[in-house]
Amino acid sequence: IDPTSKDSQPSLERAAWVAKRSQSAVELLICEYNSALDGGFFFDGPAQQKARESLLNNLSIWLDKLAQPLRDDGLTVTTEVRWGKPLHSMVLQRIDELKPDLVFRDATTHSLLQRLFFNNTSWQLIRQCPVPLWLVRKGEWKAERMCAALDPVHSADTEAVLDHLLVESTAHLAKTL
C-alpha cells in the first residue's frame, strides 16, 4: 500500500477483486522509512523513537481503516506496517516470511531522471520478487486478457523456475477470474 496516496489504491482494489473471486486471504503491507526519523539532527534518541512509533501507529490505524470494508465483505485481511530501507528489501523480506501466491503493487510513472539515476521499488521488485508480481494501474480492469512477462535469458535461474510459476499462475488466474 502506498502511504503517500491517500485517495487511490489501485493495488488494493485489484487484490480485493481477485481475492473475492479466488476466495483468498489478503495482507496489506506498508513499508515506511523517513531519514529525519532515523539518526537525523532534529530529534534526540527518545524523541526520535517516539516520533517513529507515532508515525507507524498512525499508518497502522489508516491501514486498518482500508482493510475494514474488505473484512465487512467477508474477506480475510491482515495488515502489517514495517520500518526500514531500502523499501524493496523490506517488501522482499515480508514476501519471504509470508510466502504469498501473488504480490500486487501500484504501477507508477517515473520521470526520465528518476529512471536514470534511482533504483525505484517497482523495478527492484520486478527484478527480485520470487513470486508473481502484478503491477496495477488506476482504472477498471475488464479481465479480458492476461499477459505474463518472462525472462528469456535466465542468467540467474537456469531452470526457469520463476518462469514456470508465472505461466502456471497466469493460467490459473485466467481460469479463476
Predicted regions and their residues:
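Gly/Ser-rich helix-loop-strand patches that form or flank binding pockets
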Residues: 17-21, 89-145
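A structural micro-motif
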Residues: 24, 75-77, 131
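A general structural detector for well-ordered alpha-helical segments in enzyme core domains, enriched
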Residues: 62, 66, 121, 125, ...
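General small-molecule cofactor/ligand-binding pocket signal
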Residues: 27-29, 78-82, 134
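Small/aliphatic-rich secondary-structure junction motif
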Residues: 1-47, 145-177
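A conditional alpha-helix N-cap/helix-loop micro-motif detector
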Residues: 8, 60, 84-85, 115, ...
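A short acidic, glycine-rich active-site loop
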Residues: 47-61
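Structural beta-alpha unit
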Residues: 7, 65-103, 110
